[in-house]
Amino acid sequence: MKNIKANKVVLVGDGAVGSSYAFAMVAQGVADEFVIVDIAVDKVKGDVLDLNHGMPYGESPSIIKAGSYEDCSDADLVVITAGAPQKPGETRLDLVEKNTKIFKSIVGQIMDSGFDGIFLIAANPVDVLTYVTKKVSGLPKERVIGSGTILDTARFKYELGAEFGIAPESVNASIIGEHGDSELAVWSQTSIAGQNLYDILKSNPEKEKRIEEIFLNTRDAAYDIIQAKGATYYGIAMGLLHISKAILRNQNLVLTVSSYLEGEYGNEDVYIGVPTLVNRAGAVKIYETSLNEKETKEFNHSVEVLKDITKSVDKLFQ
């Protein structure tokens, strides 16, 4: 009988986001082998032992272990959550220089192992650090993916679902652009249980005043959570789980991940959150959502915000 290749995932970064992602992956048994790498070796040992103790009660992978960058040599997916954390009052883009230096080191060591799989990046500012990862790794754009606006989209669906009294799964809505202050809601394509939002507002004008508030709640959610408890991690961990399943199980899902534009939306040479087909080969196709004039202007502004930052990143490579 022909051997079936096991799915191997390496997580780099065992902080709050990383350990939450590890728990979600192990609980759902998404990987056959799950390896955790972090400079805090005692923390990793503790988490590995803790996760292994839960194996009898979950759909766990057959192997959960502490490892090193050498373990990336035959990994299908490397997920990087490592990096300096976002502090209260600090924007994601404030983190650029220090996390770029961290990523140059991490990605360089991963590539030295012989890694030839897919990168999934979740450290902030995620669009910029995904760009850095592509630049350092030299891998094709399809195999370097950022978490993008997948969490923002989930927050948006949650807010809309709560407003209209339906499950978020019955909301068709997207946040695109930078995972940060310049992101935008694609209101023109938003539907609630199959009905266009604008049509709903015509018959429910009292809802109109809530629309901007819903977007602001979505955009600023991270700051609210950080102020309340210091960091966000459960939501993004679930988003990373969703992306990982799309890759490892070849699900062909369209997700608002951070993808590399090469002319799509009239822009290029930038990683940004856009609807993208994700499967075993990575981020294989970008879908150009129809945007109205206002949304197009906002998206182009988001591109410029990110390009201004990547210009400073490029200088760090000179």
From Swiss-Prot:
It catalyses: (S)-lactate + NAD(+) = pyruvate + NADH + H(+). It is an enzyme of class 1 (oxidoreductase). The modification Phosphotyrosine is found at Y223. One of its GO terms (molecular function) is L-lactate dehydrogenase activity. Its EC number is 1.1.1.27. One of its GO terms (cellular component) is cytoplasm. Pathway: Fermentation; pyruvate fermentation to lactate; (S)-lactate from pyruvate: step 1/1. Pfam families: Ldh_1_C, Ldh_1_N. Keywords: Cytoplasm, NAD, Oxidoreductase, Phosphoprotein. It is found in: Cytoplasm. GO terms for biological process: glycolytic process; lactate metabolic process. InterPro entries: L-lactate/malate_DH, L-lactate_DH, L-lactate_DH_AS, Lactate/malate_DH_C, Lactate/malate_DH_N, Lactate_DH/Glyco_Ohase_4_C, NAD(P)-bd_dom_sf. Signal peptide: none annotated. Substrate binds at Q86, R92, N124, P125, V126, D127, D152, T153, A154, R155, T232. The keyword Aminoacyl-tRNA synthetase does not apply. PANTHER family: L-2-HYDROXYCARBOXYLATE DEHYDROGENASE (NAD(P)(+)), L-LACTATE DEHYDROGENASE. Catalyzes the conversion of lactate to pyruvate. Homotetramer. HAMAP family: Lactate_dehydrog. Belongs to the LDH/MDH superfamily. LDH family. This is L-lactate dehydrogenase. It comes from Staphylococcus carnosus (strain TM300).
